[in-house]
Amino acid sequence: MSDRRQNRKTPDEQRKANALIINENIEAYIAICKEVGLNGDEMLILENGIAIEKAIRICCDGKYQEKREKKAREAQRADSNFNADSIGIRLVKRAGSGTNITYHAVVELTSRSRIVQILKSHWGNELNRAKIAGKRLGFSALFASNLEAIIYQRGRNAARRNGSAELFTLTQGAGIETRYKWIMEKHIGIGVLIADAKGLINGKREGKKGVDANVKLRAGTTGSPLERAMQGIEKKAFPGPLRALARRVVKANYNDAREALNVIAEASLLLKPQITNKMTMPWCMWLAARLTLKDEFANFCAYAGRRAFEVFNIAMEKIGICSFQGTIMNDDEIESIEDKAQVLMMACFGLAYEDFSLVSAMVSHPLKLRNRMKIGNFRVGEKVSTVLSPLLRFTRWAEFAQRFALQTNTSREGAQISNSAVFAVERKITTDVQRVEELLNKVQAHEDEPLQTLYKKVREQISIIGRNKSEIKEFLGSSMYDLNDQEKQNPINFRSGAHPFFFEFDPDYNPIRVKRPKKPIAKRNSNISRLEEEGMDENSEIGQAKKMKPLDQLAK
């Protein structure tokens, strides 16, 4: 048995270790909230939490700060009052009490040096070390990337620029900030690393600076950024010819290198790459869970397994989500809190590319497809309509899929072989094998004859799966369970519907350009409440109930 396996923590030990880090994050978050004037329930407003974490990531980004200071020096020549250290954070604050509570947006000023000082007091002085701030902020950046994947389909745009838009399901973590990308490599899709490698190959051809820099590689060695990218791709790629292709890219000529990367990406739609899935919540949600669980909190500090679903549910009971005027499609439309709760759930669990019918079977309320949602960008808007706690909860749970490679020479009992699954639940293959074969058949090697042989072997692997597609199942023997079924006594069978969350698959479709027709919205009188607008007495039993319940419960 390897030392690594011998030193592996038990679930209880792992949760306790997680709790130490999570509690330090919470304390730093509370201190920064107080620094910018947030108190009590204001710290539990989701949009405030997202804004604070973004400010922390910016303040810890040395290269960003260098650029900012350079611009500041230029600006100071024109304006002597310009302060490069100043940072503004847009937040939601509460005013009033009892039944007269209102919310409004404000910009609070603080300084980068003050935020860094607070972080050092809670995490230690070496914020540049990956083990100190890197992993903490890496998970924060991963959540932000998951959010953007759902709202804007960032991965599709990246895939279109670097090959085919059909590869977007390989782009988990496409929006993650560059400085956290290598720290979070095992949580990032192979398509993101392939896009980076193509950028480096193009940069080398164009003579750009930095492409030949010395960076740290595995096993303590150093090499070029392209070598680092290809090491990551080789580790993630399906065993066999795809990994052999990855090893050839660094020394290949421009055309062969790009085509080899295209083959790896297109084949990975079916010959699935390795990726690690975890639940990641904003720190305001961890704070909400701690306030409820108190002494039991450490037992729920889990990123996977049943307790990850439980702690998410507990946090959802206490957080507040804002409804602003203005959605992605319509500046006059009011956001739906229930839709934002769905996006939050999908971002925490990284479910943008999971089978939507499976996700729908695991939660308490009906879910919507992306094109039917009324959501903004989760930043603090100008006009706050209301702040409510959402009702959405998980009612079932499943183990997270770690996506280890399928061995085609076994009795077809390998792990799942599509690239979108997050949960290890048995299902049929949903990948379009014929389309993958069409993509691969377009590829021809230019000069390096061994590449042609490797391409042939890749096609053979695809064909084996294609011929046996009806018999092969992903995650054979794995199921979902009721949330109270801790011992997995009663597995729940799932019949795959293969429904995507993103309703369209037209590669030329851009959700930002396609606008829904604006619906006329009656202007509200800001001096009266919504209940009065509906002709209801705020102090009546029905009025009090409507005021306290989230929107999705009001519809019942």
UniProtKB/Swiss-Prot annotation:
The keyword S-adenosyl-L-methionine does not apply. Signal peptide: none annotated. GO terms for molecular function: RNA binding; structural molecule activity. Residues 516-556 are annotated as: Disordered. Keywords: Capsid protein, Helical capsid protein, Host nucleus, Host-virus interaction, Ribonucleoprotein, RNA-binding, Viral nucleoprotein, Viral penetration into host nucleus, Virion, Virus entry into host cell. Late in virus-infected cells, may be cleaved from a 56-kDa protein to a 53-kDa protein by a cellular caspase. This cleavage might be a marker for the onset of apoptosis in infected cells or have a specific function in virus host interaction. It is found in: Virion; Host nucleus. GO terms for cellular component: helical viral capsid; host cell; host cell nucleus; ribonucleoprotein complex; viral nucleocapsid. GO terms for biological process: symbiont entry into host cell; viral penetration into host nucleus. InterPro entries: Flu_NP (IPR002141). Belongs to the influenza viruses nucleoprotein family. HAMAP family: INFV_NCAP. Homomultimerizes to form the nucleocapsid. May bind host exportin-1/XPO1. Binds to viral genomic RNA. Protein-RNA contacts are mediated by a combination of electrostatic interactions between positively charged residues and the phosphate backbone and planar interactions between aromatic side chains and bases. Encapsidates the negative strand viral RNA, protecting it from nucleases. The encapsidated genomic RNA is termed the ribonucleoprotein (RNP) and serves as template for transcription and replication. The RNP needs to be localized in the host nucleus to start an infectious cycle, but is too large to diffuse through the nuclear pore complex. NP comprises at least 2 nuclear localization signals that are responsible for the active RNP import into the nucleus through cellular importin alpha/beta pathway. This is Nucleoprotein. It comes from Influenza C virus (strain C/Johannesburg/1/1966). The lineage of its organism: Viruses, Riboviria, Orthornavirae, Negarnaviricota, Polyploviricotina. The gene is NP.
